[in-house]
Amino acid sequence: MDKKSSHPAGAARDILIELRNAGVYRDGRWLVRNVDLSVERGEIVTLIGQNGAGKSTAAKMALHILKPDEGMVSHKPGLRIGYVPQKINIDRTLPLSVERLMTLTGPLPRKEIDAALEAVGIAHLAKAETAHLSGGEFQRALMARALARKPDIMVLDEPVQGVDFSGEAALYELIARLRDDTSCGVLLISHDLHLVMAATDRVICLNGHVCCSGTPRDVTSSPEYVRLFGSRAVGPLAVYEHHHDHTHLPDGRVLYADGTTADPIAGSTMGPRGHCHVEDGHHHDHEHHHHEGGQPRA
């Protein structure tokens, strides 16, 4: 089912986080103002904008790290948040294994650690030192750390920093898959205007305020977006909408809405024409991206 049509007409919206006319005022100026956004369960919402546009400030309001100087921010009662910050103060030269990283902010049952690492594709790196991880592997470890506490919503601030291009594609696909598997909401903050569009349901473009919002196609065709990022930003985006017409089965096969299947391992495609098939690049997971030694790195 397409996540963007997962709410039948008249059904109650399960809003996890909502900002209404929210703004932060510091040192005689508004860092960001008039921000309206909401994230529902099972939805990926992406904040995009250039450096200094107010993306991280808006995210901190959403997390209740910053109190708005105007407007309001509300959370669903009992909301559990998994947060992956833009920067994390860990000295990666010190001995620190991936499984130890998972418990830095509190103990976790072994089965929860194992399940989270498996979900992000790095179960084989549980005992690896974080200093030896690639950028993509380290980001996956941080996502696993957030995921292990079973959040209702994950807030990811620039999650592909320090990751190469193929690793970025794999991470965005992972984020979409985690949403599909757990039905959590996702608030994604990024200045990356390319691959992120393929993994999101709704885009909110910031430049000190909300310039435009809507589906990826709506936003990239809006005059406000073009004025902010320039006409060159429209063509290279290669925006496509990832319709969720399939389910990932426990044995690894992909089941499409019409009942046909595809086997990612064998590389065979048995789905109808027009689906996102396993060989067309839309289902590249962690183990499909390798460095020259054959080890998965992103």
UniProtKB/Swiss-Prot annotation:
Enzyme Commission (EC) number: 7.2.2.20
GO CC annotation: plasma membrane
Mode of membrane association: Peripheral membrane protein
Keywords recorded for this protein, A-Z: ATP-binding, Cell inner membrane, Cell membrane, Ion transport, Membrane, Nucleotide-binding, Translocase, Transport, Zinc, Zinc transport
Compartment list: Cell inner membrane
GO molecular function, one term: ABC-type zinc transporter activity
Superkingdom classification of source: Bacteria
A Gene Ontology biological process term: response to zinc ion
Reactions listed under catalytic activity: Zn(2+)(out) + ATP(in) + H2O(in) = Zn(2+)(in) + ADP(in) + phosphate(in) + H(+)(in)
Region (Disordered): 273-298
Positions with a binding annotation for ATP: 49-56
Biased composition (Basic and acidic residues): 276-298
Pfam families: ABC_tran
Domain ABC transporter: 17-232
The keyword Transport appears for this protein: yes
Described function: Part of the ABC transporter complex ZnuABC involved in zinc import. Responsible for energy coupling to the transport system.
Summary of subunit composition and partner proteins: The complex is composed of two ATP-binding proteins (ZnuC), two transmembrane proteins (ZnuB) and a solute-binding protein (ZnuA).
Family: Belongs to the ABC transporter superfamily. Zinc importer (TC 3.A.1.15.5) family.
Protein name: Zinc import ATP-binding protein ZnuC
Gene symbol of the encoding locus: znuC
